[in-house]
A protein has these predicted regions:
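Non-catalytic, conserved peripheral segments adjacent to functional cores
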Residues: 1-99, 117, 121-175
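Short beta-strand His + acidic residue motifs that chelate non-heme Fe in jelly-roll/DSBH
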Residues: 101, 109-114
Length: 175
């Protein structure tokens, strides 16, 4: 795992196994560094080589966990005044190494699926298109070392502007 970002929290999840199989508790509100409760849960399925990102929100936090498969995850702190402003962090999120990942608002996120990947995620707000922003996954100002130069992208992610342009459009996050 790369350097940590202010407010980002990685939770090592405990696996309980016996002859029947296994059990993992993926989420407890008390694990998160926020009083805002989770309001919406989602599941995203990606084929190998899919890159989703970079995306960010001004108001919403995310809590991610791998349901199956694995992905390379990249985060970038866009928060003005944050002690880790413009810093990045990378890590692997995998079902066979269960971890939860808390991503505060103002921290951009993206992932590249290494395999068939199912991501479960919770948010503290209901979906609101006015709080969905994105920028180019390979923006050179961040220097993220993605494991591929030719990912499978959605039309939306392929058309994303530079980070600088995205931040001009989105009212910047302030701590």
């Amino acid at each position: 795992m790369g350097a940590t970002l202010d407010g980002v929290k990685v939770v090592d999840l405990e696996v309980h196994s016996d002859v029947r199989g296994s059990f993992v508790e993926y989420f407890r509100q008390s694990w998160l560094p926020t009083d805002h409760a989770a309001l919406q849960g989602n599941v995203s399925r990606s084929t190998p080589g899919v890159l989703r990102g970079m995306h960010f929100h001004r108001r919403q936090w995310d809590y991610w966990f791998a349901v199956s498969g694995a992905a390379f995850v990249a985060l970038a702190d866009l928060r003005s005044g944050s002690p880790t402003e413009r810093a990045t962090m990378t890590m692997r999120l995998a079902a066979d190494e269960p971890r939860g990942l808390f991503i505060p608002s103002g921290v951009a996120h993206g992932f590249l699926s290494e395999s068939e990947f199912v991501l479960g995620y919770l948010n503290d707000r209901y979906f609101d298109g006015s709080d969905e922003f994105g920028f180019a996954w390979n923006d050179s100002s961040l220097g993220i070392d993605w494991p591929t130069a030719d990912p499978i992208l959605s039309d939306r992610d392929r058309a994303n502007p530079s980070m600088a342009e995205a931040l001009r459009v989105a009212v910047p996050y302030h701590r």
